[in-house]
Design a protein with these regions (language model features):
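Acidic helix N-cap motif at the loop->helix transition within catalytic regions
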Residues: 24-28, 49-57
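A conserved acidic beta->alpha catalytic loop
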Residues: 44-53, 98
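Short beta-strand/loop segment that forms part of the nucleotide-sugar
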Residues: 30, 38-47, 64, 94
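Acceptor/aglycone-binding surface of glycosyltransferases and processive sugar-polymer synthases
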Residues: 68-85, 90, 102-179
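Short hydrophobic beta-strand elements that form part
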Residues: 14-18, 41, 65
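Acidic donor-binding loop at a coil-to-helix junction in glycosyltransferase catalytic cores
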Residues: 180-185
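N-proximal low-complexity "stem/linker" segments adjacent to membrane-targeting elements
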Residues: 1-32
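Short, conserved active-site loop motifs that form the nucleotide-linked donor/cofactor pocket
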Residues: 13, 61-62, 117
């Protein structure tokens, strides 16, 4: 076990990976994540492709699964509940599509050591990345809506690469179950 893995475990940090039909990427994402953290929870959000089989073949992970797709927000809530029941204090979330780099997990550890109890949001490199106009608009609108709700500015409210202090989420009931739940979580954290 590496020193960083020991520090993650000592601080009670796990990684949660929600997935819906990511058969092309999930195996590699989970295996790369295991190189940086031994405590990985994968939430199978009603996958209908071979994702369940792929994650079932990976040792040393915890899988939460249910048959009907309920949305990313619901999957995150299930992952948070599982992490809390396992005694974790924090959860790093990353997407199963490969857009987040597991090698950045130590950066979350460092930020958590410097700012314990804070929600840490990883910033994606948005400049020079080819994205659809719809995706670009959605992110800009989400950033604007966050500002309206909180008076604070964030460059990328849509990134799923975050570290959550789980005690602050205990008992939280989200209004939404899909992708917008991530914005709801950031607004909630800003208010508290």
């Amino acid at each position: 076990m590496t020193n960083e893995k020991r520090l993650l475990r000592a601080r009670g940090i796990c990684v949660i990976i929600p997935t819906f039909n990511n058969e092309k990427t999930i195996g590699e994402v989970v295996k790369e994540t295991l190189c940086f953290c031994d405590d990985v929870i994968v939430v199978n959000d009603g996958c209908t492709d071979s994702t369940a089989q792929i994650i079932g073949e990976i040792d040393n992970i915890t899988v939460v699964a249910y048959s009907q797709n309920r949305g990313k927000g619901y999957a995150l809530q299930q992952g948070f509940r599982k992490a809390l029941s396992m005694g974790f204090a924090y959860a790093i979330t990353l997407d199963a599509d490969g857009q987040h780099k597991p090698e950045d997990i130590p950066l979350f550890l460092k930020a958590n050591q410097e700012h314990p109890g804070a929600l840490i949001i990883g910033a994606r490199p948005l400049q020079g990345v080819e994205r659809s106009k719809g995706s670009d608009f959605a992110n800009q609108f989400s950033n604007f809506w966050f500002f309206v709700q909180t008076g604070k500015r964030l460059e990328d409210t849509q990134t799923g690469y975050r570290l959550y202090p789980l005690h602050k989420l205990h008992g939280l009931s989200l209004l939404t179950n899909r992708y917008e739940a991530e914005l709801e979580l950031v607004v909630f954290a800003s208010w508290h």
